[in-house]
UniProtKB/Swiss-Prot annotation:
Pathway: Amino-acid biosynthesis; L-arginine biosynthesis; carbamoyl phosphate from bicarbonate: step 1/1; Pyrimidine metabolism; UMP biosynthesis via de novo pathway; (S)-dihydroorotate from bicarbonate: step 1/3. This is Carbamoyl phosphate synthase small chain. The active site is at C269, H353, E355. GO terms for molecular function: ATP binding; carbamoyl-phosphate synthase (glutamine-hydrolyzing) activity; glutaminase activity. It comes from Vibrio vulnificus (strain YJ016). It holds the Pfam family GATase. CDD domains: GATase1_CPSase (cd01744). Small subunit of the glutamine-dependent carbamoyl phosphate synthetase (CPSase). CPSase catalyzes the formation of carbamoyl phosphate from the ammonia moiety of glutamine, carbonate, and phosphate donated by ATP, constituting the first step of 2 biosynthetic pathways, one leading to arginine and/or urea and the other to pyrimidine nucleotides. The small subunit (glutamine amidotransferase) binds and cleaves glutamine to supply the large subunit with the substrate ammonia. SUPFAM superfamilies: Carbamoyl phosphate synthetase, small subunit N-terminal domain, Class I glutamine amidotransferase-like. Residues 193-379 form the Glutamine amidotransferase type-1 domain. L-glutamine binds at S47, G241, G243, L270, Q273, N311, G313, F314.
Length: 379
């Protein structure tokens, strides 16, 4: 017999449904994601730390879960909100149902609520703090109090919370449906040594860098520029991650050093915002952010439109770009800045997710541009 659950927003709105995960209470910023597929990749994306994810597509869980689809070693989302959980997970790769997967990692989830209504609230009022309560004792007043107590993501430094504790090597390329996860590549196949800052890095980003010949040393978020330079890298990668970029002063200061040294730098998502801040621009908290796999972005240099995967609640403010930065990409949904390139250094970044997972691969050539900058710098 299914247990009950409720979701309470900080404005007092209450949604009652059924529990699809663990019993308990979970608090975070409630956001919506419009992706039709890729729910496991979304749940395990460290960028969703301290966020409760609402999936707008009505049927979630159809294909079960598999370890090959994880973007990190655990679920980072605070909770999951969906319309309907199918009774059957049909997929020859499936290892566990979505419900069992949530329970195994002690993640709270709720289904059978009006996710269209919830999404309209978040679009009109902006991302809100919320609380999911699941189990036998549902206390609306307690849930509302906890939602109001949550401080919100603005000013919250989460990169240092989700980062790796120790540096490690990554040499595994992309997996295939036929071959599964590949063995680590030999150093002879990886001519470029790249230091990747882990602010909450997704595995598929690392794989796509390896596919292009990068031997990766993944380092903790607070690693000093001095320690990175001692590794003699050919380039530096700034990963995606959760929270507000402004408090990440350790990363901003380190990036300034790499820019001064003229090292090739590539940033994605939070890494994009870090590069912007290190170059003198400012960032802002968005009303409800971009979360989905169908976001159109215009490449200003090539005058083409790309469909991209997005997941961010903060953005670099184009109005604050200094002369050493030029805008390279803009969102066709709201005109927000999506890409920048230094005019004086081999450094650039992209707000969306060129590695997709889930999502389209239109922006994947950005990885190739990073390799081009490394080659030019090494010549």
């Amino acid at each position: 017999m299914s247990k009950s659950a409720l979701l309470v927003l900080e404005d007092g709105t209450v949604f009652r449904g059924v529990s699809i995960g663990a019993d308990g209470i979970s608090v975070g910023e409630v956001v919506f994601n419009t992706s039709m597929t890729g729910y496991q990749e979304i749940l395990t994306d460290p960028s969703y730390s301290q966020q409760i994810v609402t999936l707008t597509y009505p049927h979630i869980g159809n294909t079960g879960t598999t370890s090959e689809d994880e973007e990190s070693s655990s679920i980072h989302a605070q909770g999951l909100v969906i319309r309907d959980l199918p009774l059957i997970a049909s997929n020859f790769r499936s290892e566990q149902s979505l419900s069992d997967y949530l329970k195994s990692q002690n993640i709270v989830g709720i289904a059978d609520i009006d996710t269209r209504k919830l999404t309209r609230i978040l679009r009109e009022k902006g991302a809100q703090n919320g609380c999911i309560v699941a189990g036998n004792n549902l206390d609306e007043a307690l849930a509302l109090a906890k939602a109001k107590e949550f401080p919100g993501l603005k000013g919250m430094d989460l990169a240092k919370e989700v980062t790796t504790k120790e540096a490690y090597q990554w040499k595994q390329g992309s997996w295939t449906l036929e071959g599964g996860l590949p063995e680590a590549k030999d150093d002879s196949e990886l001519p470029y040594h790249v230091v990747a800052y882990d602010f909450g890095a997704k595995r598929n980003i690392l794989r796509m860098l390896v596919d292009r010949g990068c031997r990766l040393t993944v380092v903790p978020a607070e690693t000093s520029a001095e320690d990175v330079l001692a590794l003699n890298p050919d380039g530096v990668f700034l990963s995606n991650g959760p929270g507000d970029p402004a408090p990440c002063t350790y990363a901003i200061e380190a990036t300034k050093v790499f820019l001064e040294k003229g090292l090739p730098v590539f940033g994605i998502c939070l890494g994009h915002q870090i590069l912007a801040l290190a170059s003198g621009a400012k960032t802002v908290k968005m009303k409800f952010g971009h979360h989905g796999a169908n976001h159109p972005v215009k490449d200003l240099d090539r005058n083409v439109v790309m469909i991209t995967s997005q997941n961010h609640g903060f953005a670099a403010d184009e109005a604050t770009l200094p002369d050493n930065l030029r805008a390279t990409h803009v969102s066709l949904f709201d005109g927000s800045l999506q890409g920048i390139h230094r005019t004086d250094k081999p450094a650039f970044s992209f707000q969306g997710h060129p590695e997709a997972s889930p999502g389209p691969h239109d922006a994947a050539p950005l990885f190739d541009h990073f390799i081009e900058l490394i080659k030019q710098h090494s010549a």
